[in-house]
């Protein structure tokens, strides 16, 4: 979990353009918050560009005059937007319509066209998520505040990657809570009495997606 190899794989996949909307958004936000990860992405970008330049038999794309106009307009439009990748999708992050799952825990599902589920999660100070595991991978990026679990403490710009072998019980810091961006490839599996209720809630909710 959280190995350098896993993080490098995520960044390289992003640089290669192999991701859908969910992981592209997640990784771009990770690079936005983490300067060290952004430097790695630049290295991968340069490597891929060099490899591409050495390929034979590939002709440069011929552009029309109208293509140039569209490109200039697009760049100008994007430059007027905030640098935060999330703000480009949902606007002002302070005006999110949070949905309460249980006391101290709120979420907001992002409008992306992808099989992976992408959510913003907001946990009040000291709030915990019951012990759980995952049927697929889970990616968590701390946007504000911090949380801790059995494997360490995670602050703004830190990323955690979990798989089916990991069980953890995240708890938001007691000072200012935690806001995270989360991707889950499949359903979350909770343990314990409260976990059983959440599993039932998740099962019922799946019929209304």
Predicted features, each with a name:
Residues 95-125, 130:
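A short glycine-rich, His/Asp/Glu-containing loop-to-beta-strand
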Residues 107-109, 118-122, 139, 159-161, ...:
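Conserved hydrophobic/aromatic beta-strand scaffold that supports enzyme active sites
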Residues 111, 121, 130-134, 150-152, ...:
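Short histidine-centered beta-strand/loop micro-motifs
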Residues 149-170:
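Short acidic-glycine-tyrosine-enriched beta hairpin
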Residues 166-190:
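Ligand-binding loop in jelly-roll beta-barrel domains
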């Amino acid at each position: 979990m959280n190995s350098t190899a896993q993080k490098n794989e995520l960044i390289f996949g992003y640089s290669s353009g192999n991701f859908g909307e969910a992981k592209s958004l997640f990784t771009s936000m990770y690079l936005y918050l983490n300067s060290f990860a952004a430097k790695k992405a630049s290295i991968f970008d340069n490597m891929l560009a060099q490899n591409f330049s050495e390929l034979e038999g590939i002709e440069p794309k011929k552009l029309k005059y109208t293509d140039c106009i569209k490109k200039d307009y697009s760049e100008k439009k994007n430059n007027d937007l905030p640098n935060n990748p999330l703000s480009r999708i949902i606007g002002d992050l302070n005006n999110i319509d949070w949905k309460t799952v249980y006391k101290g825990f709120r979420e907001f599902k992002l409008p992306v066209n992808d099989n992976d589920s992408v959510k913003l999660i907001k946990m009040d100070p000291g709030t915990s998520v019951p012990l759980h595991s995952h049927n697929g991978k889970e990616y968590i990026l701390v946007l504000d505040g911090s949380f801790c679990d059995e494997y360490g403490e995670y602050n703004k710009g830190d990323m955690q990657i979990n798989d089916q072998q990991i069980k953890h019980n995240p708890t938001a810091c007691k000072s200012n809570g935690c806001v995270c961006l989360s991707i889950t490839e499949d359903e979350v599996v909770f343990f314990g009495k409260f976990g059983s209720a959440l599993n039932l809630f998740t099962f019922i909710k799946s019929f209304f997606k």
